[in-house]
């Protein structure tokens, strides 16, 4: 029995990055030998065991053979005669097909170290084409390592295009698509994930609402980048700089979906695109089974982001109605989230990346003023039932009006 550290732990150690999870491969052992050594079996489809002390995963070396469609249609063979090289060959990328033995020696049969140095994401073998999930995984790796200047090898991107054109991605379940997308959205450069999917044709298959934005123009005065798809990815990039929150990033991605519905004869203007985009957000989230809290914020951002941009001319009554609409009294975090997504929208434009966004500050300040109005005083004044809400709203509007006159006067007044 020989044990090797494999995959991501070896890759990240060679890149000088923190190693989070360790996976191990065991060569020359049987399931019974693992059980006798105190390991606990957890793998259903193939033999995977948990170490009795560390609880890290130890898998018996195995090979895989395509036996059906999609990413689940594989037959696994795990036995003592499966070599380390054979196990590594079934992996997706050369940089993930690395192993390290007890002595610290790197085993690299598929030139993963060379590709690490060249900053290349390259598939190990043609078997890559048998698993459509790998298209999303490569896009996610491209996003994860974009800050290190990694790029996808030409032949790998070509294979990803072939897989997409062959309809392989249609076998992916919504849950798997969302899981990869969720992981990609938490990387330093989530926009790269969606750009790679577009480059290989997968964006049109998996995210048609986003793909439809490419080629849709916006007024050059407001959007020097002109293309709405390009703006969407620039905005997502900016959101990633402003916030690590998944919900902020996802909402930013969806903020302009309504522009894909504008008839061509009305281009480049997109009047009413915010409310129009809400249905598309709902559609995308339902299809991919996106969690409800992410969906709800994305719908609100789609509907109200343009309103935030016009904050100086908003009436105090409109500002308080906005807080009602986003349910800020029960979910105060939404004020900050919407301020961030609106800022990302403005700064996610060519030449505006370093712009100040005072509207975000004003929104936060107005919220502090509105929520500081004490409910207790309204109740003590004798108001009852629905009158409490009505009086509270009046007092909030008055407080915001007083604040706005001093801090953010209407430029037209």
Swiss-Prot record:
Database matches in CDD domains: HDc, NT_ClassII-CCAase
Residues that, per the record, bind Mg(2+): 21, 23
PROSITE patterns tied to this protein: HD
Textual note on the cofactor: Magnesium is required for nucleotidyltransferase activity.
A Pfam family it matches: PolyA_pol
Keywords for the protein's UniProt record, in alphabetical order: ATP-binding, Hydrolase, Magnesium, Metal-binding, Multifunctional enzyme, Nickel, Nucleotide-binding, Nucleotidyltransferase, RNA repair, RNA-binding, Transferase, tRNA processing
GO biological process: RNA repair; tRNA 3'-terminal CCA addition
Segments forming domain HD: 228-329
Residues annotated as binding ATP: 8, 11, 91, 137, 140
InterPro entries linked: CCA_bact, HD/PDEase_dom, HD_domain, NT_sf, PolA_pol_head_dom, PolyA_RNA-bd, tRNA_CCA-adding_enzyme
Highest taxon in the source lineage: Bacteria
Catalyses which reaction(s): a tRNA precursor + 2 CTP + ATP = a tRNA with a 3' CCA end + 3 diphosphate; a tRNA with a 3' CCA end + 2 CTP + ATP = a tRNA with a 3' CCACCA end + 3 diphosphate
Residues that bind CTP: 8, 11, 91, 137, 140
This enzyme's EC code(s): 2.7.7.72, 3.1.3.-, 3.1.4.-
Function: Catalyzes the addition and repair of the essential 3'-terminal CCA sequence in tRNAs without using a nucleic acid template. Adds these three nucleotides in the order of C, C, and A to the tRNA nucleotide-73, using CTP and ATP as substrates and producing inorganic pyrophosphate. tRNA 3'-terminal CCA addition is required both for tRNA processing and repair. Also involved in tRNA surveillance by mediating tandem CCA addition to generate a CCACCA at the 3' terminus of unstable tRNAs. While stable tRNAs receive only 3'-terminal CCA, unstable tRNAs are marked with CCACCA and rapidly degraded.
HAMAP family: CCA_bact_type1, CCA_bact_type2
Subunit structure: Monomer. Can also form homodimers and oligomers.
Domain topic, free-text comment: Comprises two domains: an N-terminal domain containing the nucleotidyltransferase activity and a C-terminal HD domain associated with both phosphodiesterase and phosphatase activities.
Family: Belongs to the tRNA nucleotidyltransferase/poly(A) polymerase family. Bacterial CCA-adding enzyme type 1 subfamily.
Extra remark beyond the main annotation: A single active site specifically recognizes both ATP and CTP and is responsible for their addition.
NCBIfam families, A to Z: PRK10885.1
Name used for this protein in its record: Multifunctional CCA protein
Organism taxonomic ancestry: Bacteria, Pseudomonadati, Pseudomonadota, Gammaproteobacteria, Enterobacterales
